[in-house]
Amino acid sequence: MKSHRLANRYLAFLGIISGVLIAAGSAQTQQLQGKALVRALQRGGYLIVMRHASSPQTPPTKENADRQNINLERQLDESGRTAAAAFGNALRRLKIPVGQVLSSPTYRALETARFAQLPTPMTVPELGDNGRSMQNTNESQSAWLQKQITKFPRGSNTILITHQPNIAAAFPQWSANLSDGEALIFGSDGKGGATLVARVKIDEWPKLPD
């Protein structure tokens, strides 16, 4: 009898473990893709946290700098400008409403918004690079970004343009191998917090279906 009870307990334990694994698997597959992602974004209510588009690590010389780049900051390269423009065109083609745009004050982040033809961005120090070209970030920036993604807009989407170290510090569990221009898209978790619903590379936006 004792061995029978132990066997039943073992089977019950396996059942619990299986349930946990299934739940974990379901959580991993709840990210939106393709048409489902487009439809969700068309309804609005999401935060799109993106890394600025491609930019060389070395700032330009005075001779090579854009006319507006008076402080000789890092600026987008041709690939970055093209990708940012295609990203913006995709948002308009897909009729994805964009309300507020928050941006790092850096030239390369503002360029990303400009080439994408997004609404005029509001510059936010917490999204910036602290003037150190992102050698490190600080806890207050991470806390600000973590709080910001719980402010869900109604009927539109908010875009935040920042830097890889800021995103990695705030969301280490979701930001591994984040590429230039890639976005993390956050929605409500139904409990007052935010959850990741998609990761979209900047060159994937033009491929999304109408």
Segments predicted by a language model, with ranges:
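N-terminal signal peptide c-region/cleavage motif recognized by signal peptidases
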Residues: I22-A24
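A short, structured loop/turn motif at beta-sheet edges
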Residues: K151-G155, D189-G192
